[in-house]
Amino acid sequence: MTRPSDGGRIEVICGCMYSGKTEELIRRMRQVRIARQSYRIFTPRMDTRYAEGQVASHSGSRLEAITVATMKDILAHAEDAQVVAIDELHLFDDDPAEMVRGCQWLANRGVRVIVAGLDLNYRAEPFPAMMHLLALAEQVDKLYAICVKCGAYATRSQRLIDGKPAPADAPTIVVGGLDMYEARCRTCYEPAV
């Protein structure tokens, strides 16, 4: 058994839509840049909400990134990076187990791996890769939004179709913004039926 290298770690930033996950990832990466550490930031090919080649928060913060589809793509571009940041982990085309293995592989080689993404899908079920990384990470930060219905802390992403909750048999992944999703608390969240 090999011992993880000094300095390698996995940090997870998770939460519902509009909780500030990408904003926090960008904040951490700005610190990395100030510290003059080598880094790569990756964004999924599937996320077409903003400009390609950038991670972008809903509030408008942006950093340059490499657009990729799979963990294999990430590993191919991550050489010599001290820090690897992966935004919107749940949107990658790869098998969740491959995403987890890749993050572990990087961390075991001394890389600081920062991942951000939804912990729950619109059905309030855990995304598989995120579920495993939450258990394996050295640091976990769960962020909260504000429920659009009552103002409490929101932990759920309510997907809407024509103003009504999406049915349970709708596709799990649909990239969208304020026109499709609302942040809701446990009480105001309406389960998919």
Swiss-Prot record:
Record-listed E.C. numbers: 2.7.1.21
GO BP, sorted A to Z: DNA biosynthetic process; thymidine metabolic process
InterPro entries xrefs: P-loop_NTPase, Thymidine_kinase, Thymidine_kinase_CS
Record carries keyword Zinc: yes
Catalytic residue positions: 88 (proton acceptor)
Pfam family name, one: TK
Residues annotated for Zn(2+) binding in this entry: 147, 150, 185, 188
GO CC term, one of those recorded: cytosol
Signal peptide: none
SUPFAM superfamilies to which the protein is assigned, alphabetical: Glucocorticoid receptor-like (DNA-binding domain), P-loop containing nucleoside triphosphate hydrolases
Binding positions (ATP): 15-22, 87-90
Record keywords: ATP-binding, Cytoplasm, DNA synthesis, Kinase, Metal-binding, Nucleotide-binding, Transferase, Zinc
Catalytic reactions on record: thymidine + ATP = dTMP + ADP + H(+)
GO terms, molecular function: ATP binding; thymidine kinase activity; zinc ion binding
Major subcellular site: cytoplasm
Enzyme class: transferase
Localisation: Cytoplasm
Subunit: Homotetramer.
Record-stated family: Belongs to the thymidine kinase family.
Protein name (record): Thymidine kinase
Source organism (scientific name): Chloroflexus aurantiacus (strain ATCC 29366 / DSM 635 / J-10-fl)
